[in-house]
Amino acid sequence: MSIWLLKTEPAECGIEDIRNAEGGVMRWDGIRNFQARNMLRDRVAVGDLCLIYHSGVREPAIVGSAEVVRAAYADPAQFDPASEYYDERSRPEDPRWFCVDIRFRERFPHPLPLAEIKRTAALAAMVLLRQGRLSVQPVSEAEWRSIRGLCGVRRG
């Protein structure tokens, strides 16, 4: 099992959207960065855990967690000319972009703002602090435990 940080803008898809999706399961799509796409396609697996990070807001923060319930598959938006994620170079037989399905696990009692992440020695090596724009990032088990503790989670 691996752990990932998934960045999302809550105006498009926030932790509450994931919670309120049918069965708590949502397609996590719209990735249009090759490095993030490669991780999603090649490394993210069913059963992996995810931290949900709200970006594009006044105070970016880790707000909750989810679990991958379907491994990478072709992002259908790339084939839809009406979608903002349409890619005319993509073909169903050779897709360029991928998505996964995630299931809501929890909203943390307290969000963990980026400013606090930067001040926390145990999180100094996080990919988030080196490659901030990357929307799919690996997280170590030690980082996962530290983050959950800082967010007020007392178990798991």
Task: Please state what every model-predicted region is.
Residues 12, 59, 75:
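Flexible, glycine-rich phosphate/dinucleotide-binding loops
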Residues 1-10, 71-74, 116-118, 123-156:
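Mixed-charge, low-complexity intrinsically disordered regions
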Residues 1-46, 143, 151-156:
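Compositionally biased, charged N-terminal/linker segments
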Residues 53-59:
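Short, charged beta-turn/beta-strand-edge "cap" motif at the junction between a beta-strand
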Residues 7-8, 54, 104-106, 138:
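Pocket-edge structural micro-motifs
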Residues 64-134:
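Aromatic- and Lys/Arg-enriched surface recognition patch
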Residues 16-18, 78-79, 113-115, 147-150:
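A short secondary-structure junction signal
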